Curated annotation (Swiss-Prot):
<feature type="binding site">
    <location>
        <position position="234"/>
    </location>
    <ligand>
        <name>substrate</name>
    </ligand>
</feature>
<dbReference type="InterPro" id="IPR020082">
    <property type="entry name" value="S-Ado-L-homoCys_hydrolase_CS"/>
</dbReference>
<feature type="binding site">
    <location>
        <position position="239"/>
    </location>
    <ligand>
        <name>NAD(+)</name>
    </ligand>
</feature>
<keyword id="KW-0963">Cytoplasm</keyword>
<protein>
    <recommendedName>
        <fullName>Adenosylhomocysteinase</fullName>
        <ecNumber>3.13.2.1</ecNumber>
    </recommendedName>
</protein>
<comment type="pathway">
    <text>Amino-acid biosynthesis; L-homocysteine biosynthesis; L-homocysteine from S-adenosyl-L-homocysteine: step 1/1.</text>
</comment>
<dbReference type="Pfam" id="PF00670">
    <property type="entry name" value="AdoHcyase_NAD"/>
</dbReference>
<dbReference type="GO" id="GO:0071269">
    <property type="term" value="P:L-homocysteine biosynthetic process"/>
</dbReference>
<feature type="binding site">
    <location>
        <position position="291"/>
    </location>
    <ligand>
        <name>NAD(+)</name>
    </ligand>
</feature>
<feature type="binding site">
    <location>
        <position position="326"/>
    </location>
    <ligand>
        <name>NAD(+)</name>
    </ligand>
</feature>
<dbReference type="InterPro" id="IPR042172">
    <property type="entry name" value="Adenosylhomocyst_ase-like_sf"/>
</dbReference>
<dbReference type="GO" id="GO:0004013">
    <property type="term" value="F:adenosylhomocysteinase activity"/>
</dbReference>
<keyword id="KW-0378">Hydrolase</keyword>
<keyword id="KW-0520">NAD</keyword>
<feature type="binding site">
    <location>
        <begin position="268"/>
        <end position="273"/>
    </location>
    <ligand>
        <name>NAD(+)</name>
    </ligand>
</feature>
<dbReference type="GO" id="GO:0005829">
    <property type="term" value="C:cytosol"/>
</dbReference>
<feature type="binding site">
    <location>
        <position position="238"/>
    </location>
    <ligand>
        <name>substrate</name>
    </ligand>
</feature>
């Protein structure tokens, strides 16, 4: 029997991908995705002549998927130059990365890359020009989870005081700190120079927005930020409807498990938790929810879910899903109490929602990529998906193209806003997109789903005190 040879990854100063021969396959899927992403395609049509992003140098840190490829090429169609890396070591679709690389875009993303490679690649997306030149670094960041933004802030602090890198609290922090030290050893002002021309950042996720808000509150945020996550057409669509479809897809691809009849415990009942709970219930699981917020807990109860604690669910549930964006949601004591063959996964953001570090000392057996059996001292095994990272992207292909069109339309519009109107946004502050732009994103997607919009009469508009063309709701309205 002949051995199966894996292709050698391609790595240069302007790309690191798994296999360039996958480019044709990736391009075919990109073409299909474009037909399912009406928001991005409409933005291309509207703005391609005006080139509002001409001169923009965008550092992109976001899952390198087929849908992201459509986003990248939309930004380029509007005049931007981009350098791209994935924001998760398991989320890259190698054929998407290959297609983008083949088109000449600098991209650094390999599914299953090491953490060292991850931070090397995140550094690489800031290298736009020669040292000391105008345009050496980016003038915009497009971020997902905040790692690119974090790197610039932490690196600048380390330039002044290496002591900030002295006490890593996790393996990932240890590797990040080592990467920063290595960069500073050869170039002591690298982070300051790369940040010098950054106008602002647009952030995709709840986790990244939390980081931005924290820095803004402390007065340490170096540039302007737009919180894309809290656009209604992102959080109420991507977070809810996207997770509703991609969670069970990831679990099914990984395990082939029958979900009907199982007890599934969803940690968190925000938008991601709501979508996850709906998906599991649609497949006839008994869904339990854990919550810290009494309002969300009451919402879950009113939807018919049993609201419990993780301590209660640990030895009873069959499937566990974390959706919170917090840390240590499933701890060692919870996993130690679980049933044999319990499935544990995360669709929040970082892998610390599940205390994976506490079970690294046990015996691990890889069933297939991103599916591991972990044997506890008593002989019981649990099935951990994507090593605690995002299950929908680690074990599946992420959200469908249509819902990502809505999210990425927000990202593109936010990039245009910050780049073309920097004086309208104060450095160090975090903003959301104006309501009329949120409504615009929704309008761009109505035709695709066959939706007809009713138009107000002049009398009706006057009666409720709004313009016939919107915005239709106050900023305080909760959709």
């Amino acid at each position: 029997m002949s051995a199966v040879l894996k292709p050698t990854p391609v790595s240069t100063a302007d790309q690191a991908i798994a296999d360039l021969s996958l480019a044709a396959w990736g391009r075919k899927e990109i073409k299909i995705a474009e037909t399912e992403m009406p928001g991005l395609m409409a933005i291309r049509e509207e703005f391609s002549k005006a080139q509002p992003l001409k001169g923009a140098r965008i550092t992109g840190s976001l899952h390198m998927t087929i849908q992201t490829a459509v986003l990248i090429e939309t930004l380029q169609a509007l005049g931007a130059t981009v350098r791209w890396a994935s924001c998760n070591i398991f989320s890259t679709q190698d054929h998407a990365a290959a297609a983008i690389a083949a088109a000449g875009t600098p991209v650094f993303a390999i599914k299953g890359e090491s953490l060292k490679d991850y931070w090397d690649y995140t550094h690489a997306i800031f290298d736009f020009g020669p040292k000391g030149s105008q345009g050496e670094g980016p003038n915009m960041i497009l971020d997902d989870g905040g790692d690119a933004t974090l790197l610039m802030h932490l690196g600048q602090r380390a330039e002044k005081d290496l002591g900030v890198l002295s006490k890593p609290t996790s393996e990932e922090e240890r590797i990040l700190y080592a990467a920063i030290k290595a960069k500073l050893a050869v170039d002591p002002t690298w982070y300051t120079r790369k940040s010098a021309e950054i106008i602002g950042v647009t952030e995709e996720t709840t986790t990244g927005v939390h980081r931005l808000n924290e820095m803004s509150a402390k007065g340490t945020l170096l540039f302007r930020a737009i919180n894309v996550n809290d656009s209604v057409t992102k959080s109420k669509f991507d977070n809810l409807y996207g997770c509703r479809e991609s969670l069970v897809d990831g679990i099914k691809r990984a395990t082939d498990v029958m979900i009907a009849g199982k007890v599934a415990c969803v940690a968190g009942y925000g938008d991601v938790g709501k979508g996850s709970a709906q998906a599991l219930r649609a497949l006839s699981a008994q869904v339990w929810v854990t919550e810290i917020d009494p309002i969300n807990a009451l919402q879950a109860a009113m939807e018919g879910y049993k609201v419990v604690t993780m301590e209660y669910a640990a030895d009873k549930a069959d499937i566990f899903v974390t959706t919170t964006g917090n840390r240590d949601v499933i701890r060692h004591e919870h996993m130690a109490a679980m049933k044999d063959q319990a499935i544990v996964c995360n669709i929040g953001h970082f892998d610390n929602e599940i205390d994976v570090a506490s079970i690294e000392k046990y015996e691990w057996e890889e069933i297939k990529p991103q599916v591991d059996h972990i044997t506890f001292p008593d002989g019981k095994k649990i099935i951990l998906l994507a090593k605690g990272r995002l299950v929908n992207l680690g074990c599946g292909t992420g959200h469908p193209s249509f819902v990502m069109s809505s999210s990425f339309a927000n990202q593109t519009i936010a990039q245009i806003e910050l780049f073309t109107k920097p004086d309208a946004y104060q450095a160090g502050k975090v903003y959301v997109l104006p309501k009329h732009l949120d409504e615009k994103v929704a309008r761009l997607h109505l035709k695709k789903v066959g939706a007809m919009l009713t138009e107000l009469t002049d009398e009706q508009a006057a009666y409720i005190g709004v313009s016939k063309n919107g915005p239709y709701k106050p900023d305080t309205y909760r959709y």
